[in-house]
Each structure stands twice: as C-alpha cells, then as structure tokens.
C-alpha cells in the first residue's frame, strides 16, 4: 500500500489535513478498482471519483521500477499540495492533467512534488518535479518521454533555470509553500517550434549550477513573461529579478533542427557568467542533438543595435524596449503567456492575446 500525506489550503488561514492509501497492484491490474482507507477524506474521495474512469497503467512505458504508474486524463481540485513527505514512491507520469477550478484568468495545473518527468500529450503540458542536490525542484530526467510527436517541443523547462527561492516565489499559491504550477497550455498554440530535447534542463544542471549557487540563490524572479511570435517561430522570455535585474532570453528555431539563442541582461556580472560558459553550453547542447547556430550574450543596448535592421526581430526588440511597461500591466500574476497577432508587427497592447 502507498501512503500519501497532504495538506489542502482552502484559503490563507484554513488548512485541512488527511491521507489516503492506494494499492499499486490493483492500479496496474484494474483501472476501475481502488483501495482507499476507511477514513475517506472528502477532498480525495472526490478526486478519486473523478479519476475513476480514466486511471490507467501503461505497460509499454519505459519502466523505472515496479511503482511506475501512468495516470491518464485525471481531474482534481486546484488546491496546493504540501511538498514534505508527499508520497513514498518516486515516479509518476501524468497525461492531460487539468484543473476544474480556475483562478482569475489562469488554469491551475495540479502538480505533485517528486514527479521525475513531464510529458506532453496533445493539448497540455505537464511539469514533473523531484528533489535535487542544489534545489528542492528539478525538472525531468528521461527527456525523450517529453514528446508526443516530433513536432512538439518542451521549451518550458525554463523553470529549471530558476533557483529554489525563485520557484517558491513564483509558484507558491499562498506563500506557505503550497506548490501548484499555474498554467496549462494548448498544444496547437504553443508547440509549433520544432523539437528541442534538453535545452533548459541543461541550463540548470550544466550551466547555472556550475556557477556559484549562493549567487544564483538571489535570482528570485518576481515576474516572468513569455511572448510567442508565430510568424517568425520565435520565443521570448523576460525574467525580472529584484536583486539582479531582468534577463531577456530569445530563441529562434531554424528548420525545426537548430536554434539561435540570445541571452540579454542589464547586469555585467550576469553577462560575464553567461559568457564564461558559452562554449561549454554549446558543446553540451550539440551532444544532445541540438544544433546551435549561435549563442549570443549581450547587454540590452548591444542586442537592440544588433536587431535594429532585422525585420523579423523588430517585435522582439520592441518587447525588450517596453518590458517594464508590460510587466507593470501583469498586476499580481507571476507568469503570463502572450501571442502576437499574426498580421500585426506594431507593438500594441490591444493586439496581444493572453491565452493562459
């Protein structure tokens, strides 16, 4: 039997605790049979009922151990889950994990700590978390399982780029260390940018953590914006840090095979760290099958000068010029995704469609 402990936060002051038990053998053998403890908590009873017709063990998945369970089309309430001692087994893969309750303009994506992978299945993105040496969370190990087909990519393990304090700041529901990733994504809008295997996972494990961890622990991003330009197949991340300023990360996918990567920062110390690791990062990416056309590290002014005459990148330079204004318009939300209208290259807030 597997024991699962949890905390459920219904508001800032009320916390409900409980536990339930699942029998792994029955989960594998019969998808409609569940073993739940006699002390059935309402929260998990409802969750189990919603899962009842959809839970499934997938035998053809690459099994890490006997407790490797595949949960398909699960639905559950959008309450936070406490990280400490969450479950006794380590490996889950979730597919189509959506949340019923929505908060403001976001759909809360219910994420369990200690999940070691995330998996893309048609119209959603799943983030897997597990403990690592340097931070409480690390995204993904078996990167090949991220992709539903060759046309998909998982650039959003950019979260690996963040230190533990950053994750706490951005993704805590009520600042009491209840974790829930705050977005779900539509594949048709997001995953049009080719196939990239380990880019951001490498950013953390091979790139960021090779630097001084005490330095990066200050890297607390209060806001993160993601802009998608469908016409040019470009993705732009803007990360804003109270201590270290803003970091602008720009990707252009070329023929679904190679990438151009620009790292733009206003702080010289960040620029120097990036520059000192460019060759190493490029070699690691190449070993993973990602052909990097170029990796450029520059200041804000250098980047603007470089793209000033490039029509395809005018929008990206406009974002960089106005990111402070954009960030101020996101109110209290930490993460939002934007898509530029396909026919509009003028920077106009009315033509930016927020779809998360």
Curated annotation (Swiss-Prot):
Q: Which cysteines are joined by disulfide bonds?
A: none
Q: Does the keyword Transmembrane apply?
A: no
Q: Record keywords: Ubl conjugation included?
A: no
The lineage's top-level taxon is Bacteria
Role this protein plays: Controls the length of the flagellar hook.
* Domain text: Two-domain protein with the central portion of the sequence acting as a hinge or connector between the two.
**Protein name, per record:** Flagellar hook-length control protein
**Source taxonomy:** Bacteria, Pseudomonadati, Pseudomonadota, Gammaproteobacteria, Enterobacterales
């Amino acid at each position: 039997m597997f024991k699962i402990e949890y905390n459920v936060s219904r508001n800032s002051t009320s916390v409900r605790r409980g536990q339930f038990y699942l029998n792994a053998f029955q989960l594998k053998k019969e998808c409609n049979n569940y073993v739940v403890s006699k002390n059935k908590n309402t929260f998990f009873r409802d969750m189990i009922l919603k899962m009842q017709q959809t839970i499934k063990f997938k035998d053809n998945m690459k099994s890490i151990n006997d407790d490797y369970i595949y949960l398909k089309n699960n639905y559950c309430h959008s309450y936070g889950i406490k990280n400490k001692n969450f479950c006794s087994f380590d490996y889950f893969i979730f597919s189509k994990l959506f949340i019923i309750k929505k908060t403001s303009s976001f759909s809360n994506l219910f994420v369990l700590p200690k999940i070691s992978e995330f998996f893309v299945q048609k119209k959603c993105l799943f983030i897997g978390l597990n403990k690592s040496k340097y931070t409480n969370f690390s995204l993904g190990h078996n990167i090949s399982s991220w992709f539903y087909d060759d046309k998909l990519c998982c650039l959003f393990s950019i979260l690996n780029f963040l230190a533990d304090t950053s994750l706490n700041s951005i993704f805590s529901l009520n600042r009491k260390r209840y974790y829930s990733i705050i977005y779900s994504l539509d594949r048709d809008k997001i995953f049009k940018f080719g196939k990239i295997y380990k880019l951001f996972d490498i950013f953390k494990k091979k790139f960021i953590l090779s630097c001084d961890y005490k330095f990066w622990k200050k890297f607390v991003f209060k806001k993160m914006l993601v802009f998608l330009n469908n016409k040019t197949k470009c993705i732009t991340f803007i990360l804003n840090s109270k201590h270290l300023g803003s970091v602008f990360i720009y990707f252009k996918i070329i023929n679904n095979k190679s990438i151009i990567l620009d790292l733009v920062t206003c702080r010289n110390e960040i620029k120097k760290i990036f520059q000192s690791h460019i060759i190493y990062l490029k070699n690691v990416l190449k070993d993973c099958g990602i052909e990097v056309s170029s990796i450029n590290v520059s200041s804000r002014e250098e980047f603007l000068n470089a793209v000033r005459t490039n029509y395809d990148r005018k929008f990206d330079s406009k974002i960089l010029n106005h990111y402070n204004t954009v960030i101020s318009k996101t109110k209290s939300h930490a993460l939002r995704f934007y898509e530029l209208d396909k026919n509009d290259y003028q920077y106009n807030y009315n033509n930016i469609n927020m779809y998360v």
